[in-house]
A protein has these predicted regions:
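Left-handed beta-helix
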Residues: 1-119
Length: 119
């Protein structure tokens, strides 16, 4: 991710059960959205894979959101890879164990936190 200009965001698939879309969101250049994004901000070069959802979240550059993953009320740090089927922001107790959860219910996810989970 150098200083050059990125291509525009791309929304892919046009099938009834699989359609990339963003509603009331800001999506930066270089993003590819195959899942659903709602009231969120995606920084550059974010990939939201098929059947994934990102709701009320801020996703920093270079993040990959895996297939069928669900991210709600979260801040995802730069370069993170959210594994397929992972759920973030829906279970306060589980989120507090795995990540950092603020008093207001926002979950912060970093690469280091995800690496600890993989061990």
């Amino acid at each position: 991710m150098g200083g050059g200009q990125l291509p525009p965001a791309k929304f892919v698939h046009n099938q009834d059960d699989r359609r990339g879309l963003a509603i009331e969101s800001l999506v930066s250049g270089g993003c590819i959205v195959s899942g659903h994004v709602f009231r969120s901000v995606l920084f550059s070069s974010v990939r939201v894979h098929s059947h994934a959802t990102v709701n009320w979240s801020v996703v920093l550059p270079g993040v990959q959101v895996g297939r069928h993953a669900r991210v709600t009320r979260a801040v995802i740090d730069r370069g993170c890879t959210i594994p397929d089927h992972m759920v973030i922001g829906e279970d306060p107790v589980l989120d507090a164990e795995r990540f950092y959860r603020s008093e207001s219910g926002i979950t912060l996810v970093t690469r280091e936190m995800l690496e600890r989970l993989a061990q």
